[in-house]
């Protein structure tokens, strides 16, 4: 805080990232690079630190459990992916989070949080030559670990029929959604599918908005396409008004997605 640095982190299905935001300053950049290089190999993952952070983690768990759309999407994921790890949440089950032994976390850190498994990104008002020299000075001496990273080999089998999941909870929010398996980021179809998700889900010009929201079948509608290391999902969703007809909204949502085969995307 004394240096004006804002630290944060995010976790996704494919990666975890740690980042620092601060005013462009050579001294601060030097300090951050030195710190990041040090904690990449010398972090002390202690039981007391886990205990002190448990309240924060529980709050994140509860926030996720109380997010209707998040809960629905997770149930969809666990239904769509029966074998691949994409069917699990990034934060994990409450019992695992609260009961994980500290030695498991230490082993995970030693296995994955290493320089040969990381990408360093520096953006802002910088001098490239100066920054690269600083990076080489701090990260260059780090030894490549002796361990070999495991290769993930699980491929989700082709889905053999439609799957459906219903989530019932206390509250008055109603959601309908449909998800479709899509190829991995490196596949040539990944970029076109991102465009397709925008054509479907854009507000107010998207097909879902026009067919559902403007027709008063939904209060909101959207779509999202994933860009993942392995095959993911393209999901379309609609928020159904309390006095609306969920079955009609679902039918129209499916119609808009499935008629893409007969009603191609135009330039306008």
Locations of regions flagged by a protein language model:
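M16 family metallopeptidases and their MPP-like homologs
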Residues: 1-38, 69-95, 117-123, 172-184, ...
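PPIase-associated folding chaperone regions across multiple families
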Residues: 188-195, 213
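Non-catalytic, conformational "gating/processing" segments within enzyme and secreted inhibitor domains
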Residues: 54, 69, 104-138
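Short amphipathic alpha-helical coupling segments at ligand-binding clamshell hinges
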Residues: 192, 196, 249-252
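Histidine-acidic residue clusters that define the catalytic metal-binding segment
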Residues: 18, 34-35, 60, 78-118, ...
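Acidic/histidine-enriched alpha-helical segments
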Residues: 1, 44-62, 127, 146-162, ...
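An aromatic/glycine/proline-enriched structural segment found at the starts
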Residues: 82, 86, 90, 119-184
């Amino acid at each position: 805080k004394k240096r004006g640095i804002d630290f944060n982190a995010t976790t996704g299905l494919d990666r975890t990232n740690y980042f620092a935001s601060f005013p462009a300053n050579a001294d601060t950049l030097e300090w951050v690079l030195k710190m990041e290089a040090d904690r990449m190999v010398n972090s002390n993952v202690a039981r007391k630190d886990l205990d002190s952070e448990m309240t924060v983690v529980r709050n994140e768990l509860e926030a996720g459990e109380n997010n209707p759309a998040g809960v629905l999407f997770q149930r969809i994921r666990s239904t769509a992916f029966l074998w691949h790890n994409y069917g699990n949440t990034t934060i994990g089950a409450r019992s695992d989070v609260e009961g994980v032994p500290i030695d498991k976390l230490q082993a995970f850190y030693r296995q994955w949080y290493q320089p040969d498994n990381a990408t360093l990104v520096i953006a802002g008002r910088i001098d490239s030559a100066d920054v690269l020299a600083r990076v080489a000075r701090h990260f260059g001496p780090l030894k490549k670990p002796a361990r070999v990273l495991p290769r993930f080999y699980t491929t989700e089998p082709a889905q053999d029929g439609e799957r459906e999941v219903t989530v019932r909870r206390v509250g008055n929010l109603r959601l309908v959604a449909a998800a479709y398996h899509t190829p991995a980021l490196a596949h040539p179809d990944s970029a076109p599918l991102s465009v397709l998700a925008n054509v479907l889900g854009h507000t107010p010009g998207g097909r879902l908005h026009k067919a559902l929201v403007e027709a008063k079948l939904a209060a909101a509608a959207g779509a999202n396409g994933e860009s993942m290391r392995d095959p993911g999902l393209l999901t379309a969703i609609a928020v159904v008004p309390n006095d609306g007809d969920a079955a009609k909204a679902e039918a129209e949502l499916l119609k808009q997605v499935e008629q893409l085969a007969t009603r191609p995307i135009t330039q306008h």
